[in-house]
Each structure stands twice: as structure tokens, then as C-alpha cells.
């Protein structure tokens, strides 16, 4: 009987060590921190958006939590955003704004990494790409430069997204497809990419 108890204790201790070494989530973070991290991610998008409207997140999920020390961590989040009816100058909380409605209102899929210390946001990095009916792919992925443009000007500016230069050719083909689906209303902006400005300090 004693041998059986000792054997069970050894298995239990070994199993706990194994989970810790393989990244078993042992950090007990406050759910309020997750909400703050998501709000900071959306705020980062809205702060650099070209759109006159605020974006709001939905279908959010946490992908990973990395404990840096006993008081700091990073969170990897995935969420979707869509324009709301609230204008930027209103300074409203996007979470309280209604989504815009209509067939041509796009949805972007975003991933963010948020570094927190003492339960406060320190740094935020965000990367998004527009969703499509066929699903996302590497050729559709775009990185934030001047970020998201308004849905009212999406025809001429491809929503303000700046392409990843390493995938320039696939993105050019994608832009031609989007222009076929959403014909340009103003031919003066038929080639928006040379006008795009890249913000090197933001990913």
C-alpha cells in the first residue's frame, strides 16, 4: 500500500513538472486585464486609422499568455473589427457604438500582442488583413502603415491598408480583383499605392 502511494506521488510530481516545462499556463491573470488589452488594441487601430469612423472589435479570443516575470506578461489576441456609426471626433467608446450595416461594409481580422506590467498596458502591436468570402490567405495579408481607411473611400484607397512589400505582386493582383468588385468612383485615385505612406514605428 505504501509503495502504491509513493508511486502515485512520484507520478503526480513528475506530471506537474512536465506541464510547467511545456508551457502549461500557470499565470493567473485577471480577466479585466484581457479586456484592457483588447481595448488598447482597438484604440491603437483607431488612433492611426484613416477612417472618419471608429472601429469596434468582436469575436475576440486570447491565443497565448507569456509571463515575463511575476508582474509582467504579454498577451496574444485575435479579433475582428468593423466600422461603427460613431465618428472619430466624437471620442466615444467604440464598445458603445453600433456597427455600420450594409453588404459592402468590410470586416478585418486582426492579431495583436500586448505587453502589460502591474496590470497596465505598456506596449501594443497590431497587424490586420481584410476578411473575404474565400477566407484569408497570405496573399491578402497587409500590414498597418497609415492603417484602415474609411469604407466611404474604399474604392479608391483600398481601405487605406499598406501592403507588405515582400508580397507586392500577389497584392497587386488582389487589388485588381477588388477594383473589379468595387469599381472606382474617382479615376484620379486609380493607382493609390504610390501615395501610401508607411509608418516604420508601427507594425
UniProtKB/Swiss-Prot annotation:
Primary localisation category: secreted
Q: What is the protein name stated in its UniProt record?
A: Secreted phosphoprotein 24
What family is this protein classified in? Answer: Belongs to the SPP2 family.
- Where does the record locate the signal sequence feature? 1-23
Post-translational modification as stated in the protein's UniProt record: Multiply phosphorylated at serine residues.
* UniProt keyword Amino-acid biosynthesis present: no
SS bond list: 86-97, 110-128
User: Residues bearing Phosphoserine?
Assistant: 90, 138-139, 166, 175
Question: What PANTHER family does the record point to?
Answer: SECRETED PHOSPHOPROTEIN 24
Q: Which Pfam family is an annotated match for this chain, by its short name?
A: Spp-24
One GO BP annotation is: bone remodeling
- Where in the cell does this protein reside? Secreted
Q: What are the boundaries of the region Disordered? A: 155-174
Cellular component (GO) terms are: extracellular region
Function according to Swiss-Prot or TrEMBL: Could coordinate an aspect of bone turnover.
Lineage per the UniProt record: Eukaryota, Metazoa, Chordata, Craniata, Vertebrata
